[in-house]
């Protein structure tokens, strides 16, 4: 197979300069056919991109940077491509013999200007890949913005996820065209200079904030609830939430409660801001709340978070997120709660975050936020299945089954209510961890998947502070998390001995 990109030579960018495109682990050759510019770009765009590169990106090259030297190997069109990917807004060549003629569209329009217009209107666009041979929409997705710093960073993010979708289509595997949770947001469109100026101002403000405060600073909320909980009400109403105290220079996130052999513990990510690396810790809960101190239970040389727990064949297992290590590892509890041994590697050679498992119709299904090395971290859902927890695990026929920043990334345990399977998902439409949604799974098999978001949850009077990105329950105990402003001076002051309750276990008010 040969793939041909059609791009405007006057606006050649680094993301276009590639010899291959990775498709299902194979490097498929890419050739580029340069075309004349169909539409002029906003005045001074490349100068603004260069300013962002120097200030926002600290001089690091990015995918939206202009190519200074056009590679000779791409100057001529060989005419042998099997798949054409036309990134311009020019009319399709009616005599093109390629079996697929793919046209990315951004909020319904083609070309880089359409992507820029969406960004300048206040949001990343919905991406659709259209086969111009018959007009069919072959895939649809909405990228997340974790790496979208500035106008150039946003454009790079959009094109990275566009290539993800192109690779999935070119693989020949069936695609699931999702109905996205939300359309792209729009505001009054700013000019590029104003957009960049605002981005630089925001970046400076964030740097000042990070000098004064730990950012982000996550904390855990808990409550005992004898009645209908979040899953039944679709909101955060009910008994008030209490914040699990922390020492200030650590944050706690991703709470997973479990009762094992008569004792209940909440496991969570414990990140020391001074080190910048997470471990897994736990704290016991009694009938009235936390008991004793936080106990470290699992540490590796790499960052750990999201300690998903599952009981299987009489054993307790943990799958902490270890995406920086490039695998999905399974740990066995050999002494509860504080001794765990690595037992197996379920998946290797991939970047998969927040692995979460459910069982359905005799199979195990593992969901995770998948990333192919570029673009956002929270928009792509991959599913794997197996007959046994230890595997072997096989990929879903349509991976990634969904690209949607508002409903892809897992946010806690699956639940079954009245025979229906549900999962909490992160809603990152307004930024990473900004909110939660409750999604009902309508179809799930090795070849099908469909979910519908039924409820959305945001921080507010019932959960003050900022952000909300995990939901779990064990018996009466419900847990969530969020973030707050945490000044570094307060964290320093809290290290001195005092007569008050230990900050690790004392309840406090979310703020």
Protein language model annotation of sequence segments:
Residues 1-265, 269-304, 308-311, 317, ...:
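One-carbon transfer enzymes
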Residues 235-245, 289-297, 335-349, 384-406, ...:
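Blade-edge beta-strand/turn elements of extracellular beta-propeller
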Residues 271-275, 323-326, 371-375, 428-431, ...:
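Short glycine/acidic-enriched loop and turn motifs that connect beta-strands
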Residues 430, 434-444, 451-453, 460-503:
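Blade-level signature of beta-propeller repeat domains, shared across WD40, Kelch, NHL, RCC1
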Residues 267-269, 319-321, 367-369, 424-426, ...:
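Residue-level marker for isolated small/hydroxyl-bearing positions within beta-strands
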Residues 253-256, 305-310, 353-358, 410-415, ...:
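Beta-rich, blade/repeat-based domains predominating
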Residues 359-390, 403-440:
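Loop/turn-rich, solvent-exposed surfaces of beta-rich toroidal or solenoidal domains
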């Amino acid at each position: 197979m040969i793939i041909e990109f059609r791009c405007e030579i006057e606006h050649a960018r680094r993301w276009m300069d590639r010899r291959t495109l990775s498709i299902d682990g194979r490097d498929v050759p890419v050739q580029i056919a340069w075309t004349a510019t169909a539409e002029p770009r906003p005045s001074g765009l490349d100068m603004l991109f260069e300013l962002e590169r120097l200030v926002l990106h600290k001089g690091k090259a990015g995918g939206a940077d202009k190519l200074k030297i056009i590679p000779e190997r791409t100057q001529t069109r060989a005419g042998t491509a099997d798949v054409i990917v036309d990134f311009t807004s020019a009319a399709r060549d009616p005599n093109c013999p390629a079996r697929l003629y793919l046209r990315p569209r951004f909020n319904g329009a083609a070309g880089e200007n359409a992507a820029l217009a969406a960004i300048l209107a206040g949001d990343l666009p919905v991406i659709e890949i259209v086969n111009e041979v018959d007009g069919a929409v072959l895939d649809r997705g909405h990228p997340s913005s974790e790496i979208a710093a500035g106008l150039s960073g946003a454009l790079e993010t959009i094109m990275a996820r566009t290539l993800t979708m192109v690779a999935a289509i070119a693989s020949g595997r069936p695609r699931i065209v999702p109905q996205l949770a939300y359309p792209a947001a729009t505001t009054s469109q700013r000019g590029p200079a104003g957009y960049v100026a605002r981005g630089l101002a925001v970046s400076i403000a964030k740097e000042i904030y990070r000098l004064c405060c730990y950012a982000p600073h996550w904390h855990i909320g808990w409550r005992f609830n004898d009645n209908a909980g979040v899953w039944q009400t679709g909101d955060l109403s009910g008994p008030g939430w209490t914040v699990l105290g922390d020492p200030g220079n650590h944050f706690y996130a991703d709470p997973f409660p479990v009762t094992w052999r008569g004792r209940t513990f909440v496991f969570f990510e414990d990140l020391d801001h001074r080190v910048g690396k997470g471990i897994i810790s736990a704290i016991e809960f009694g009938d009235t709340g936390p008991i004793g101190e936080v106990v470290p239970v699992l540490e590796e040389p790499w960052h750990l978070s999201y300690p998903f727990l599952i009981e299987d064949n009489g054993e307790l297992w943990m799958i902490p997120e270890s995406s920086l290590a490039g695998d999905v590892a399974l740990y066995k509890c050999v002494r509860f709660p504080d001794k765990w041994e690595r037992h197996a590697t379920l998946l290797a050679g991939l970047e998969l975050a927040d692995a979460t498992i459910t069982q359905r119709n005799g199979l195990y299904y593992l969901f995770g936020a998948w990333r192919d090395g570029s673009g956002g971290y929270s928009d792509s859902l991959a599913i794997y299945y197996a007959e046994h927890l230890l595997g072997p695990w096989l990929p879903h026929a349509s991976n990634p089954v969904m690209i949607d920043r508002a409903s892809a990334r897992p946010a806690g345990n699956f639940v079954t209510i009245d025979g229906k399977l549900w999962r909490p998902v992160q809603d990152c439409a307004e930024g990473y961890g900004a909110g939660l949604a409750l999604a009902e799974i309508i179809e799930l098999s090795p070849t099908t998947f469909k979910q519908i978001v039924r409820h959305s949850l945001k921080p507010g009077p019932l959960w003050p502070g900022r952000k909300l990105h995990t939901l779990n329950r064990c018996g009466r105990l419900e847990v969530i998390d969020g973030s707050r402003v945490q000044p570094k001076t307060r964290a320093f002051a809290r290290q001195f001995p005092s007569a008050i309750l230990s900050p690790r276990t004392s309840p406090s008010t979310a703020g």
